[in-house]
Amino acid sequence: MVLLRTRDLTRASVLLALGIVLPSLCHLSGIPGQVFLPMHIPVFLGGFLLGSGESFLLGVVLPPVNFLVSGMPPFPNFFVMMGELGVYGLASSLFFRRLRWGIVPSLFGAMLLGRAVAISGYSVLFAILGRDFNVLSLLQSLFVVSLPGIAIQLVAVPGLAALILRRERDVAGYPRLL
């Protein structure tokens, strides 16, 4: 049985709350979630601040919790997002903590892996629903429509993660950004 330290449990709780509040603010302001990707930020932060299991769980739990709170992401899309966000949390944590990549390369690698999972998930979902699967529109949604969210992630996540991690380490132990 794995026991979470108080710090990790507190961080996971704050990130879960942030993962509910940010999408709610987007929806209230009329900004589509697929443009700013508000659930992604807490999951990526979790990848750098929590263990791989906790950050994976955070990514898997956020979409259905948000669906229950706000109805978004819509059913059955949240199933695909559970896989995508789970991989974001798991991959960013493994790249950063196990492979010792810097924050930005870990974030970028996790973004690519998560989007690959999303593409696979949507192809399976469309096959189950008997819909035509248009790869180009999905790629446009994952990479073009969401460019503002990707830009926000590439700026905000490394800065916030480095700031939080820096406060825990000695002066000589600053986390690598690159």
Task: Give short role names for the model-derived ranges.
Residues M1-L178:
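Loop-helix junctions at membrane interfaces
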